[in-house]
Amino acid sequence: MASNKRPRSILVACSLTLLLFFATFASNGCEGDDAPWVLSLQPYFTDSDLEWDPELVGTWLSDDSSLKMTFTEGEKRAYKLLVVESDSGDQKSGQFEAHLLRLGSDWFLDLFPTGQLPSTEFIEMHLLRAHSTARLELHQNSIQLSFLSGAWLKKQLKQQIVDLPYQETQGMLLLTGTTEDVQRFIYFHADDGAFSDEARLFRQEDQE
């Protein structure tokens, strides 16, 4: 059963990693203030891993309307994803490229930001785009996204239970290994509590 806790900001977790200005993105998190974001320099997929499911296309909305995700068809078995987050009347949106893949018996999404932030060329020099991932459960009228838990991963790394190249900086765990490294990690630890930052969304009918 999905957790009732509101997930931390997906736009923060998945969007441009601001190595220069990261501290400006304050967010109330279900894992606590000390839980780092988890991002990967390399994608979680290779071209041969990619799958396509037309049932994912459409608009999905959380129970409290704080999170809306709209998937449309992209190129080369990719989805275009628009994420809109609402909080006390304040609305923010971000654009992503999403890829669907299967590792073991589970489905996952790789999310990569494609939208532009208003900035100067100098500022853009200091921004890093990185990948995030979530385990996906796709049902007829709902989806559940379980994002990689930074609190869980940080604990496993410190206890040397997980062996994965990474750097910790600015409240973030930046995975620096290869695609093979991060896939192996997911394959062996997906059911160990690694994916516990959950969001459930419900399909919205097309409005004529």
Predicted regions and their residues:
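N-terminal secretory signal peptides that target proteins for export/translocation
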Residues: 1-8
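Bacterial N-terminal signal peptides
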Residues: 14-25
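Calycin-type beta-barrel ligand-binding domains and close structural analogs
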Residues: 30-55, 63-208
